[in-house]
Amino acid sequence: MRTPSQTVGPYFAIGLSRRDESALAPRTDPAALTLVGRLLDGQGVGISDGMIEIWDGARWARSGTDSEGRFGFTVTKPEPAPGSVPRFDVWVFARGLLRHQLTRLYFPDEPNETDPVLAALDDEGRRTLVAAAEDGALRFDIHMQGDRATAFFEH
């Protein structure tokens, strides 16, 4: 028997850990990448009390969003799963969600056209899952709704 889900908010951020869990690599690692983004609602307004988790097999990191919806991580590129390209699974937690949402983050410098999941999406869906190189970092904005909505997956 499944227990019904309930929304996360409105006081979701109160329970967030205050320790820094946003690094999968030390900033001094020559292979370290800075990953930044914003969690945005359907009107493009930052969601201030969300939490983003990224997963790569056994590795994971977590970042709460700030007052503008910004989040950030220090990562190294993950090893690809068999038949895939390097990527992170991205879990989104925010007020108003009955269940956390799952999406993926792909890297712009990989042969993403060979990934079977990306190949199954239309051009717009694929575009929402590939981070953009910007000012020495990777940017990955997550749009929960609207014209620029990020592609999410059932889980």
Spans of features found by a protein language model:
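Beta-strand-dominated extracellular/periplasmic modules and repeats
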Residues: 1-128, 133-155
